[in-house]
Amino acid sequence: VSFRDYAVDFGTVFFDRGGGDIRQVHLYEKRRGVTSFIGIPYKKNLFSLAYFYEDHDNKTALTAAEKAALNLGIFAGLTGEYKYGDAEKFPASISDENGRSIRLTVNMTNKHLGSGDRNEQVIFSGDWREYVKLYKSHVLALRAAGGMTWGDRLVQGTFGLGGAIGEGTLASGGSYNYFPLRGLPVSALSRTRAMLFSTEYRFPIIEPLRGLGTAPFFLKDISGAIFADYGNAWNAHEGGSDSFKDFFDDFMLGVGAELRGNFIIGHGLPIHGRIGYAIIVLNRDRVERLNDPLLGTSIKYGMLVLALGYAF
């Protein structure tokens, strides 16, 4: 059993007040809930089943009309998940290598399980990652992920696409319904369906294995990565999503590079940090009115990547 109290970033949301008056807000939701779960491992596989009960409310200040337009309140139901992993990692590794990880998730919220009657959905998502060792600690990392939703359409969306939120210690990424596409702000698109393909070439630069005197800080290694993220988020039957011929027309491509480091803080807290640059080079016109939240500049000039945790 676990208890959770956290916030979710839904990115920029626009509220139509009528008469051409559009209000733009950066929407955060606060969530509190309890989860009871069981997991059954078998060799390199893990099967799990959980019941969750969460109360969702706005953290960002909203008017009564704006709050009523969103799908808030109680979300309760079941989550079933399958995971597989056989990737390797050694003391000199900068990344997982020589293997793969797979995750398949089904999430169901229903009023008979305690959910609000506007918050009933069936959500499926999948995530496949391959790590190919090229030479010494050089790695080619590949990822294919996506998700679909059936049932009530949440105004604020189900899947968030965009940003560089990482996974691991002190990082908040890794959720089944978040897809990082670098070159976009966090959850720049939030829809009922999403798809993402990512490729990274990861290479070592230096391995200092040094601390700062007696300070509780240790630098293990510094590495680099060149990456490309290709994805989109959309609602069912939107645009050309029902036609294979037009399906990829609105997909965006973000490319860039990152400098990465593995640190030890205190006496044993491992931290992975990333700093870099990313820019959308395909279908940039879809999001060029958005700004980099760190620099305040238009994302048509690219975005600063500053994050904790592994990209994937």
What label would you give each PLM region?
Residues 36-38, 132, 263:
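Hydrophobic, Leu/Ile/Phe/Ala-enriched alpha-helical segments that form helix-helix packing faces
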Residues 46-48, 139-141, 268-272:
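Membrane-spanning beta-strand positions in outer-membrane beta-barrel proteins
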Residues 245-277:
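C-terminal structured "cap/appendage" subdomains that terminate the fold
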Residues 1-92, 101, 173-179, 187-188, ...:
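Gram-negative/organellar outer-membrane beta-barrel architecture
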Residues 73-228, 234-248, 286-300, 304-312:
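C-terminal outer-membrane beta-barrel translocator/porin domains of Gram-negative envelope proteins
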Residues 7, 232-233:
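Active-site/binding-pocket entry motifs
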Residues 227-231, 260-264, 276-280, 311:
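Short, loop-centered acidic/histidine patches that primarily coordinate divalent metals
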